[in-house]
Structure formats: C-alpha cells, structure tokens
UniProtKB/Swiss-Prot annotation:
Sequence positions that bind Ca(2+) 4: 144, 146, 148, 150, 155
Taxonomic path: Eukaryota, Viridiplantae, Streptophyta, Embryophyta, Tracheophyta
UniProt keyword Repeat present: yes
Name assigned to this protein: Caltractin
Residues that, per the record, bind Ca(2+) 3: 108, 110, 112, 114, 119
Top-level taxon in the UniProt lineage: Eukaryota
Length: 167
C-alpha cells in the first residue's frame, strides 16, 4: 500500500463543520418545513419564506442570487446540503455584523450613534495606545463619508467591511 494513498481520519467530514449541532438542526427543520411540496429541494419562493423565518429580510434579487450561487445543477432549486452551506455563510455574516455592532457601541461611549475623536482617544488610552490628534483625525476622515467629523454606524460597518473584518 502506497503512503500517498493513505486517507486521513482526523479531517472534518462534510461542509457543515462550522455549525453547532443545534444550529444545524434548526436549519434542517426550516428546510423540511419550507420544502412544502416534499421534493427535497427549495425553490426561490420557499427560500424567501425560510430566510424570513430564520431572521433574514431579503429582496427577490438577493434570493435569486443566493440560489444561483449554490445551485450546481441549474435547476433553480437547492437541496439540503446546498441550503446548509448557504446558511452557514449567512449565519457567519450575521454573527460578524453583531460583533461589529457590539464594538461600535463600546467605542460610542456617549451613545449618540457616532464615534467622535474623543471616543477614539478614550478607547485608545484604555487599550494602551497613544494616538496623536492627527492620527485620530486621519482615522475619522478615512471612514467619514458625510464629512460631519464623526463616524456613524453605517460608515463604521462600511469601513470594517473593507478590512479583514468583512461580514
């Protein structure tokens, strides 16, 4: 037997290793519930209802794009594995966005919905960083699209999306 043909047993099987068993079960139940014709697949209309039930509001174009992204046979419908793969990505996006929202609220000390230069100075000091006024001004200008001198939540999320924290 050639060592090149040895199969590794410790490798995770399947495409769903990023999900908890409970989350996978919820996705399976949603799939079965919304596979209304019992075909073993979900079409665009069924997917839209399933996504809303799982807490995602989506446009018809987004639904059709999601199907196109995972529909390997071009049938216009997706099976459970495709649905699970797609939902793993969507849940990851939502979790990352929730984490970014928590970070925004921590930085926005006065809870006015905007990150000010003072907010950045305070959090930097708490983290042991020492930024100059110019450093902070540059950070704000990088993200501040409406040019009000502060960073609102949309600007913050857009900025973070351009970095390694993409959601």
């Amino acid at each position: 037997m050639s060592s090149a043909r040895t199969v590794r047993k410790d490798k995770p099987r399947g495409r769903h290793h990023g999900l908890t068993q409970q989350k996978r079960q919820e996705i399976k139940e949603a799939f079965e519930l919304f596979d209304t014709d019992g075909s073993g697949t979900i079409d665009a209309k069924e997917l839209n209802v399933a996504m809303r039930a799982l807490g995602f509001e989506m446009t018809e174009e987004q639904i059709n794009q999601m199907i196109a992204d995972v529909d390997k046979d071009g049938s216009g419908a997706i099976d459970f594995d495709e649905f699970c793969h797609m939902m793993t990505a969507k849940i990851g996006e939502r979790d990352t966005k929730e984490e970014l929202m928590k970070a925004f609220r921590i930085i926005d000390q006065d809870n006015n919905g905007k990150i000010s230069p003072e907010d950045i100075q305070r959090i930097a000091k708490e983290l042991g960083e020492n930024f100059t006024v110019k450093d902070i001004q540059d950070m704000i200008e990088e993200a501040d699209r409406d040019r009000d001198g502060e960073v609102n939540v949309e600007e913050f999320l857009r900025m973070m999306k351009r970095t390694s924290y993409a959601y």
